[in-house]
Amino acid sequence: MQKPGQNIDFALKETSPKIGAGSVTGDKLCSTYDLVEQMHYLYVRVVKAKELPGKDVTGSCDPYVEVKLGNYRGMTKHFEKRSNPEWKQVFAFSKERIQASILEVVVKDKDVVLDDLIGRIMFDLNEIPKRVPPDSPLAPQWYRLEDRHGRKVKGELMLAVWMGTQADEAFSDAWHSDAATVGPEGVTHIRSKVYLSPKLWYVRVNVIEAQDLIPHDKTKFPEVYVKAMLGNQTLRTRISQTKTLNPMWNEDLMFVVAEPFEEALILAVEDRVAPNKDETLGRCAIPLQNVQRRLDHRPLNSRWFNLEKHIMVEGEQKEIKFASRIHLRIFLEGGYHVLDESTHYSSDLRPTAKQLWKPSIGLLEVGIISAHGLMPMKSKDGKGTTDAYCVAKYGQKWIRTRTIVDSFTPKWNEQYTWEVFDTCTVITFGAFDNGHIPGGSGKDLRIGKVRIRLSTLEADRIYTHSYPLLVFHPSGIKKTGEIQLAVRFTCLSLINMLHMYSQPLLPKMHYIHPLSVLQLDSLRHQAMNIVSARLNRAEPPLRKEIVEYMLDVDSHMWSMRRSKANFFRIMNVLSGLIAVGKWFDQICNWRNPITTILIHVLFIILVLYPELILPTVFLYLFLIGIWNFRWRPRHPPHMDTRLSHADAVHPDELDEEFDTFPTSRSSEIVRMRYDRLRSIGGRVQTVIGDLATQGERFLSLLSWRDPRATTLFVLFCLIAAIVLYVTPFQVVALLAGIYVLRHPRFRHKLPSVPLNLFRRLPARSDSLL
């Protein structure tokens, strides 16, 4: 699992948690939560009360319920002047932390100084029933209240008390004893939730033409363009080349929009009357609810829209109706996949229109078990603490675990399931510190992130590993802990899964009507902003900093470290070809005579029987694949600090990576970095120039730029054509191969004649300034 040279602290570790997969617990098979460790809870459901006696002078009461178990106390909200209140609240106490044998449920009357006791109910924990799904929920019962001496008093309380697990339906909305220090205002921020990304569409606006425009200055030809606005997205067409009152553009503008459509598309026709002054000639607003939808590449009908104009008359805005109009073709593109995350870590590749979706090929089940070794993320009461929760994103579904308060070893043991439509996708996990509970900073801090590509997983196998949580800081890479996950990919149809590998990665509209790289980058940025804004409006919100971190918003920003990492990745890819070249050089120089003789024999066989060449190549590749099967990866890939060049990054390069855009550093630092970038660019420029020179020399072979060199090459081609025509191909190939593999005794160290001729050819470098 650990790669050579990698720090063992940053390595992936295989674990053996006590999960319920395939095991029998009690009398029931744990199938719903079989990828997590089973956690037992005491549940208390407080439903309502009736006929509570009045304790005030007025004869009324302000009741609330207090559930006490040892040192833990949970309270419902209180009602004013209600003798028959309804709470419908659930309390969950972790069995691991229970240190008492009696559960006490107390009904009290809220008072200014001291709350009065109305009555209580006592439960022996040994007598409480057990309930595990798929059993039906336990029906609540009416219990008569008792005073401190055990005597029956007036009033009844409807309760349900049972021992259950985290698989219980009441678990997610319950008050938890491990969050007892969190006040009522913070409870909503610590519960587990499932979020759905908004459904995103591309909006294509084909601006065709306008008619009968009325400019203010009729003495000059108008320079007209169309400005389109949708939310905070603004795009402009080019200025029309037809300088008339009926300009034409026939230009496409692309936007991103999310359902439900809350904003209208606003189009304004503007005239460039001066370099920094534009005049609006008319505008129109188009609700997107009325826009037609396109699922394929078939053209749709265009429409004419009337333009309106508003002017100020005596301080009031008045609308002028005139005959100007604009010709548009507007539709929602359902055949594209709207990219809202980094293209390298996409978790969903389906088109927007659900009619075009293909059947799912499998299920992805994930158990978020625990974390350990977390670093203190904030200070509370003079000591470091962490309130950790986990977020996972795959497809349109986001999940957020509950927050474990004040723990460096949180145990979540929550299990989630996703449908899988393509294995060439990535699920992303992020761990965060909750900053929205008492003592928090108001911002959720990053603890670390884990990515798992589904295509690297074997079907129907459970992967249980502890993944390092790594975060970049201005001081360098820092390990903030480890997270323990259990992952299982279940294949529903092997035929469909294998057939998927023959299909295009993206929907067909991306290939029939492709979008430019600049368009895709801009649209992806807009889609990220829309998803971030929508999830930030949920309750509880999934904060903007969380969504941006999970979607890798800053993945396109310049980083010297990433550039080095990508360069060495290329060198690693080319290392195989370089090794083959070195091996061939050793063969040609007879470093190992036996191997060289065997290569001669193999070469002669292939020349005499050329029909064996392709079968031999594919058989060789087959044998390599079978041989490598013994050493196939048995664990998912993880964040590699050595590959990322994160373990030896220069402090200034790291500071540059954390710089804002535009820069916020001093002019001296920016000048130094600019000079460094110029130096690197100069070396890149030299390499590119050398490549261009070699290509231009090749083109000049027949260009007669050097008449003597071209004459020699033309004569050589004529002689070669005659020789190859009269000589069997096998003889030519055999002689050429033996010449290349000749013994060093028949070689000399000077360059060959063809190479000498090639290096003497002219290039366009002489024409550069």
UniProtKB/Swiss-Prot annotation:
Database matches in Pfam families: C2 (PF00168), PRT_C (PF08372)
Family of the protein in this entry: Belongs to the MCTP family.
Bilayer topology term: Multi-pass membrane protein
InterPro entries found in the cross-reference section: C2_dom, C2_domain_sf, C2B_MCTP_PRT_plant, C2C_MCTP_PRT_plant, C2D_MCTP_PRT_plant, MCTP_C, QUIRKY-like
UniProt GO molecular function: glycosyltransferase activity; metal ion binding
SUPFAM superfamilies referenced in this protein's UniProt entry, alphabetically: C2 domain (Calcium/lipid-binding domain, CaLB)
Gene name per UniProt: MCTP5
Domain C2: from-to ranges: 23-143, 184-305, 345-467
Binding residues for Ca(2+) 2: 56, 109, 111, 116
Tissue-specific expression: Highly expressed in roots meristems and shoot apical meristems (SAMs). Observed in flowers.
Cofactor dependency: Ca(2+)
Main location: endoplasmic reticulum
Function (record text): May function as a signaling molecule by regulating the trafficking of other regulators.
Transmembrane parts of this sequence: 604-624, 712-732
Location of this chain's protein in the cell: Endoplasmic reticulum membrane
Record-linked SMART domains: C2 (SM00239)
Protein name per the record: Multiple C2 domain and transmembrane region protein 5
Organism: Arabidopsis thaliana
